[in-house]
Amino acid sequence: MWELVETVRSMLNSLHDGEISVSAYDTAWVARVPALDGSNTPQFPMCLNWIMNNQLEDGSWGDRDLFLTYDRICSALACAIALKTWNTGDKIVHKALEFIRKTMPKMELEDSTHMPIGFEIVFPAMIEEAMALELDIDYTAPVLQTIYAERKKKLERIPMNVVQNYPTTLLHSLEGLHKTIDWDKVIKLQSPDGSLLFSPASTACALMHTGNEKCLQYLNNLVKRFNCAVPNVYPVDLFEHLWIVDRLQRLGISRYFTQEIKSALDYVYRYWTDKGIAWARGSPVQDADDTSMAFRLLRSHGYDISPDAFKTFQEGDSFVCFSGQAGQAVTGMYNLYRASQVMFPGETILEEAGSFARKFLEGKRQENQLYDKWIISKDLPGEVEFALDNPMHARLERLATRRYIDQYAADDVWIGKSLYRMPFVNNPIFLELAKADFNMCRALHRKEFQQLERWYDESSLSMFKGFSRSKLEQTFYSAAATIFEPELSPARLIWSQCWFLSLGINEYFDYQGSTKELEDLINNVERWNVNSLGNCSAKVKILFVELYNIVQNHSKQGFLYQGRSIGGALREIWKTWLSSLLQRTKWKMSDNYPTLEEYLKASHSSIEPAVRSTVYFVGETLATGDLKDSAICQMMNTASRLVQDTHTDKVDSSLNSITIYLEENPQLTESEALSQVQALANKNMQKLLYETLQPGALPQACKQLFLNAARIMNVFPGTNKVQAKLSNHVKRVLSQPVL
C-alpha cells in the first residue's frame, strides 16, 4: 500500500498546468494555420501528420473507447477540412466523409446534453467551409436546421458587440465566428499566455487572421508539450488541483497527503478573485463550477474566503455557471449545492444559491435526468442523490467514503469542445489505494469491536434494557465512521464506551429510574468512592461502579497522552452531564416551563461525555483551561438538542424546544413552531461550523470532534430510532470489505 501512497505523492508533487488528453478537433485547427513566412505550407506540419496517423478504423477521430455522435462528427469534419485545405490524405478524407454521411442522421437521436461545448457555434461554420471545399456530405440534413436554430439563439443571448469587447465564453469558440468578428478588437481580449480563453482551436483561428506572436508562442508550447497534437483546452491547472483534492478527500485517503494538499490549495488561493475563478489561472471569465469547488475546499481547510464571489453568477432569482449559457449543467449545480453546505451564519448569498441548486437538482431527479453536459461518469445520479439525501451537517465521513469508492471510476470522460480525460483526476491508482486503505481500517475496527464486546461481557450492564449489544455496535460505528484513522484506536474505544454508557443511563432514567435514583447517582459521582455508595438502589450501584471503572481506566490512559492527570476533568464531565439530566427531569415534573434560552443553556446532549472525554486522545496536548473556556461544547449541545427535539419521542413530548417555543409564541401552530425550531437548529449548525473552522486555543482535531458529534446527532437524532437507521450503515462500514 505504501508504494501506492508514494506513487500518488509523486503525482501531486508534479502538478503544473494539468495532465489532459489531446483533441483531434483542436489539433485539426492548429494544422490549418498557414506558415507565417508566406510559403504555401502549414505552420504546424507535425499536427497534420498527427491527424493522418490517428484516424480510427471507422473513419472518425476521437476517444477510442467512447463513441458520442456529436463529438465524432465534429472531429471528423474538422480533420477532413484540415487535410483538404492542404490537399493531402485523399484516402483519409474519403473515409472521413463516408463516416460523416453515414453517421450524421444519428445526431437527431443523440441526447443534446452530450453535445460538445460550443458545438452549435463551430459546427455550422465548418459546414459552410466544407461546402466551399466541395466536400461530399449531405448539406440538407434536417438536423443541420436544428443546429442552425440553436446557433441563432445563442448569438442572440450574447450580441456580437459584447463578444468583441468583453470577455465571454464565446472567446472559447471564435473559430465558429471568424468570418464575422473584428479581429483587431477581439485580440485585445487575449489571455496573458497568448491564448483566446485557453482554447487551442480559437487561438489557432486568431493566429490565422492576425499573425499575433503571442498566439504563435502559445501554440508552439502546446505542440511541443503534447507531442505534435494539442488538447481541447489548456492550461487546466486550477481545475486539476481542485478536483484531485476533492477526489482524494472523498475516497478517504487525503490524510496521506496533507502537505501536498496544502500546497495545491495554496496554489488555488493565490489565484482566487472576488469574482471567483475558472479552470485556469488568470482567466478573464469565471465559472460557478470551479468557483464552487474552490470555495468549499478552501473554506473547509480554514482559508479566509468570502462567498460574495457567487454574486457573479446570480441572475435575478437564478444562478448560472456562465453568463449567456444555453442550459444548466447538473455538475455545476451539484457543486454549487455542495459549496452552500459550508455556509456561515448570515451568508444570504449561499442560502439563496443552495436553495436554487437543490430545487434544480430535485427537479432533475424527479425527471430521471441526473446526467450532465460536462462529464460522463460512472454514477453521477448516485452522487447527486447521496448529496441531496445526506446534507453535510447530517453526513458521516466513512459512510460517504464507502459510497464514493463504489461510484468513483478511473475512466470518467469529460466533455469540452471534444471528449477528454484527466488522468490525474481519474485513475486506477487512487481507487486501488482507497480500497486498500478502507479494508485495512475496517479490519482494525472489527478487532476493536471485539475488544469492546469482551468489555461488555465482563460488565453488568446487560441486565439493563438500554444497554444492548446492538447499541454497543452502533455507538462504535459512530466512532469508526468519523474518527477512523488507525492511530486513533484509543479514541474510538473511549468514545464508544462513553456514549454507550450515557445512552443507557439516559434511557434508564427516561423509562424506569426515579428522580431520587438519579440524585443518588450524582452524589456518588461527587464522592467518587466505590467502597462507600450510601443508601441507594442496586441498579444505581451497578451504574456507578461501571461508570467508575470506565473513568478510572480512561484516566490512566489519559496520563500517557497528556502527561498529567485528567481524572478530575473526566469526573467533572459526567457530573455536569448527569446534573443536566436531573434538571431536565425536574422541569418535566414541574408545571413551570423554562424559557427556550434557559432550556437550551441547560441541555447537555447524550453524546457530550463521549466527545469531551475523547478530546484528550486525538494526539493534541490540551492545557487545563482549553476545553473549559471554549464555547464549542455549548454550540454542539444546542444544535444536538434542537435536532433531537424536532424528532422527539412521545416520552419527551411534555418538554422540548417545540413545546417551549409554542408557549412563548402561542399565535403559532405546531407545524409553524416546528419549522422555526428546525431553522434554529440549522443556524446553530452553521455557528458550530464557523467555530470549528476558526483559529483558536482548542486544536483543530479537537474541535472537529464536536462538529462530528453534532453531525452524528443529526443523522440519528432519537435514541429509539438509532437501531433501525444504523443497521445497514454498520454493515457497510464495519462488516463489508471493499472488493
Curated annotation (Swiss-Prot):
Cofactor(s) annotated in UniProt: Mg(2+)
Name of the molecule in the record: Copalyl diphosphate synthase 1
EC number(s) reported in the record: 5.5.1.12
Motif (DXDD motif): 287-290
InterPro entries in the cross-refs: Isoprenoid_synthase_dom_sf, Terpene_cyclase_plant_C1, Terpene_synth_N, Terpene_synth_N_sf, Terpene_synthase-like, Terpene_synthase_metal-bd, Terpenoid_cyclase/PrenylTrfase
Domain notes: The Asp-Xaa-Asp-Asp (DXDD) motif is important for the catalytic activity, presumably through binding to Mg(2+).
Pathway linked to the protein: Secondary metabolite biosynthesis; terpenoid biosynthesis
GO BP, sorted A to Z: diterpenoid biosynthetic process
Binding site for substrate: 154, 373
Other comment: S.moellendorffii contains two distinct types of functional terpene synthases (TPS) genes, the typical seed plants TPS genes (SmTPSs) and the microbial type TPS genes (SmMTPSLs).
Reactions it catalyzes: (2E,6E,10E)-geranylgeranyl diphosphate = (+)-copalyl diphosphate
Family of the protein in this entry: Belongs to the terpene synthase family.
UniProt KW keywords: Isomerase, Magnesium, Metal-binding
Residues engaged in binding Mg(2+): 287, 289
Metal-binding in keyword set: yes
Organism: Selaginella moellendorffii (Spikemoss)
Molecular function per GO: copalyl diphosphate synthase activity; magnesium ion binding; terpene synthase activity
Role: Monofunctional diterpene synthase converting geranylgeranyl diphosphate to copalyl diphosphate.
